[in-house]
């Protein structure tokens, strides 16, 4: 059998993840659509969750770590009164507790308690490792592992609406935040229990859901949905290099320039091609390459 020939594909696909499928399963499907040798996502969504799942192809995988560290925005639906073992609707019911009469003032008061710097205990149903194994493997066997609370930051926590025992809210949070756990903690603060019945991601760093597409749409017109590598980095200052400085950066050299507005910057060569990410060294007052990309020259086929 002939060895599979991969395409030289570099870019980002903003996938609109549907409910009921895994992030890794979708990643492999998108990879096959583009016949890309390398592919990675920028933070998995649980199977029940939907929304923005950026897929990095080819050289874009070099910046997936930057996106993993990005803040995320979600819209969540919290069902009060019923606790599940996973904190979402896919889990097994554990217990029910009566829900107090809700009011907008009560909910907003509770929400305000979770804004800012917060310590959060990660859930058992998570991919965090314990002795080399993900926690969810222990959870599925009924084994409880003690987990230390970790610092997270909640930038915004806004009530959207509520009806009977269902509350919808929007949250902008730091990396490492488990919105399932946030929902459980909100329920506890309200004097009851709860689990998420819906979770929709609308933002990852500078990327928003405005241009995301379903897998079916991507399969029909894949070229239209392949975004440039620098799309998620628009918040970084752009540094346009001359030929001499381009050569220096591409060979690992450092530049003595004025301090940039952002600690990380985008490098462009004289042809205005994005060639990598730079990092400002405060102590040395120098700009050094952090991530460089081996991209196709202008005019190369990306089909």
Swiss-Prot record:
Source taxon at top rank: Bacteria
Q: Where are the transmembrane segments?
A: none
Q: What class of enzyme is it?
A: isomerase
Annotated active site: 46 (nucleophile)
Any GO molecular function = tRNA pseudouridine(55) synthase activity
Q: List the SUPFAM superfamilies.
A: Pseudouridine synthase
Spell out the Gene3D superfamilies in the cross-references.
Pseudouridine synthase, PUA domain
Q: Which InterPro entries match?
A: PsdUridine_synth_cat_dom_sf, PsdUridine_synth_N, PUA_sf, tRNA_psdUridine_synth_TruB, tRNA_sdUridine_synth_fam1_C, TruB_C
Q: Could you tell me the EC number(s) of this protein?
A: 5.4.99.25
- Provide the GO biological process annotations: mRNA pseudouridine synthesis; tRNA pseudouridine synthesis
UniProt keyword terms in alphabetical order: Isomerase, tRNA processing
- Provide the catalytic activity annotation: uridine(55) in tRNA = pseudouridine(55) in tRNA
Q: Output the NCBIfam families linked to this UniProt entry.
A: TruB
Cited function: Responsible for synthesis of pseudouridine from uracil-55 in the psi GC loop of transfer RNAs.
* Identification of the protein by name: tRNA pseudouridine synthase B
Q: Which organism is it from?
A: Hydrogenovibrio crunogenus (strain DSM 25203 / XCL-2)
């Amino acid at each position: 059998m002939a060895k599979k020939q991969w395409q030289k594909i570099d870019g980002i696909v903003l996938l609109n993840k549907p409910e009921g499928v895994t992030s890794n399963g979708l990643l492999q499907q998108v990879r096959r659509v583009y016949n890309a040798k390398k592919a990675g996502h920028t933070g998995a969504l649980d199977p029940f969750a939907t929304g923005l799942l950026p897929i990095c192809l080819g050289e874009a995988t070099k910046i997936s770590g930057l996106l993993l560290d990005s803040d995320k925005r979600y819209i969540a639906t919290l069902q009060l009164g019923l606790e599940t073992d996973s904190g979402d609707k896919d889990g097994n019911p554990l217990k029910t507790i009566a829900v107090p009469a809700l009011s907008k003032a009560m909910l907003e008061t509770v929400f305000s308690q979770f804004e800012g710097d917060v310590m959060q205990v990660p859930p058992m149903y998570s991919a965090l490792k314990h002795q080399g194994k993900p926690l969810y493997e222990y959870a599925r066997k009924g084994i409880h592992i003690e987990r230390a609370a970790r610092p997270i930051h909640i930038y915004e926590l806004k009530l959207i609406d509520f009806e009977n025992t269902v509350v919808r809210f929007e949250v902008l949070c730091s990396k490492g935040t488990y919105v399932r756990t946030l929902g459980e903690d909100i329920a506890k603060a309200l004097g009851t229990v709860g689990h998420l019945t819906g979770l929709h991601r609308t933002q990852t760093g500078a990327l928003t859901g405005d241009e995301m597409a379903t897998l079916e749409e991507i399969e029909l017109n894949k070229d239209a949905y392949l975004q440039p590598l620098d799309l998620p980095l628009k918040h970084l200052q752009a540094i346009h290099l001359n030929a001499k400085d381009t050569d220096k950066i591409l060979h690992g050299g450092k530049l003595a320039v004025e301090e940039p507005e952002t600690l990380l910057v985008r490098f462009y060569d004289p042809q205005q091609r994005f060639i990598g990410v730079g990092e400002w060294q405060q102590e040395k007052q120098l700009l050094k390459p952090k991530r460089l990309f081996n991209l196709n020259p202008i005019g190369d086929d990306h089909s």
